[in-house]
Amino acid sequence: MSKMMVFTGNANPDLARRVVRQLHIPLGDVSVGKFSDGEISVEINENVRGKDVFLIQPTCAPTNDNLMELVVMADAFRRSSATRITAVIPYFGYARQDRRPRSARVAISAKVVADMLTVVGVNRVLTVDLHADQIQGFFDIPVDNIYGSPVLVDDIEDQRFENLMIVSPDIGGVVRARAVAKSLGVDLAIIDKRRPKANQSEVMHIIGDVEGRTCVLVDDMVDTAGTLGHAAKALKEHGAAKVIAYCTHPVLSGRAIENIEKSVLDELVVTNTIPLSAAAQACGRIRQLDIAPVVAEAMRRISNEESISAMFR
């Protein structure tokens, strides 16, 4: 642990401070700012030669600024002779374009970001709940994708919900929701979204009996909260007594707060992989959990060459 040093950019300094408190080490001294024309400026204010450096920087909004901060920081530490550089990216932005749909002329931006990080000297990446697990394969360096579910499950248990049922908001999230349901020993329901015909509104079919149940929607992220709002409405229409959503990443873009306040969702519980905006903090239906202990433990294990997978057995 003596060679371990932790630094952060401007994306989520509060999370970085929480992580170093868990590790009982100081936060490293680096100046990350901008030149007058908007270019990213990085200067390391202490010796990092021979050190095991961890850079905590989610690539959340403003996505491009935060990504460039991470890239320029990594280059600065490589040129300053750090032995190993681990990019700790609690929320991995640019993850939604992870494949090229047939006949579509689009970029695979997740691969572009992976290449950028590798080129500037990042030796290892630590992420939380990647939007798509296959993104790990875009990297030519080791990637540890840890799960936020233990933090969510612990809170669900603490709430002592009556007649609890876990719900996947779509078919793609079934594996995640099933794992949470299995961990809690409760039933699982699935929302199957279908569009009967072109230009017709989406119809939500509920697979499972939610009548009188406390339904907990589980997803990796909440963006505009439109899907969660529609899911909560469908569940209430099918007799659910209460609907709470648990999501690891609070992206909360666009009209998300307005959508949450207008919805029948009783509560939205998120982690601090992304800092909440002032509007989100003021929303009485949003509650934030601390994921720093899980991130800190993963970082400790990486630094000590211990197993990461053992954390989730």
UniProtKB/Swiss-Prot annotation:
InterPro entries in the record: PRib_PP_synth_CS, Pribosyltran_N, PRibTrfase_dom, PRTase-like, Rib-P_diPkinase, Rib-P_diPkinase_bac
Any one Gene Ontology BP term: ribonucleoside monophosphate biosynthetic process
Cofactor-binding details, from the entry: Binds 2 Mg(2+) ions per subunit.
Reactions it catalyzes: D-ribose 5-phosphate + ATP = 5-phospho-alpha-D-ribose 1-diphosphate + AMP + H(+)
Annotated active site: 193
Cofactor: Mg(2+)
E.C. number(s) listed in UniProt: 2.7.6.1
One GO location term (cellular component): ribose phosphate diphosphokinase complex
Tree of life domain: Bacteria
Annotated metabolic or biological route of this protein: Metabolic intermediate biosynthesis; 5-phospho-alpha-D-ribose 1-diphosphate biosynthesis; 5-phospho-alpha-D-ribose 1-diphosphate from D-ribose 5-phosphate (route I): step 1/1
Keywords: ATP-binding, Cytoplasm, Kinase, Magnesium, Metal-binding, Nucleotide biosynthesis, Nucleotide-binding, Transferase
Residues given in the record as Mg(2+) 2 binding sites: 170
Quaternary organization: Homohexamer.
Family, as annotated: Belongs to the ribose-phosphate pyrophosphokinase family. Class I subfamily.
Function per UniProt: Involved in the biosynthesis of the central metabolite phospho-alpha-D-ribosyl-1-pyrophosphate (PRPP) via the transfer of pyrophosphoryl group from ATP to 1-hydroxyl of ribose-5-phosphate (Rib-5-P).
PANTHER family per record: RIBOSE-PHOSPHATE DIPHOSPHOKINASE FAMILY MEMBER, RIBOSE-PHOSPHATE PYROPHOSPHOKINASE 1, CHLOROPLASTIC
Protein name: Ribose-phosphate pyrophosphokinase
Naturally occurring in which organism (per UniProt): Pseudomonas aeruginosa (strain ATCC 15692 / DSM 22644 / CIP 104116 / JCM 14847 / LMG 12228 / 1C / PRS 101 / PAO1)
Gene this protein is translated from: prs
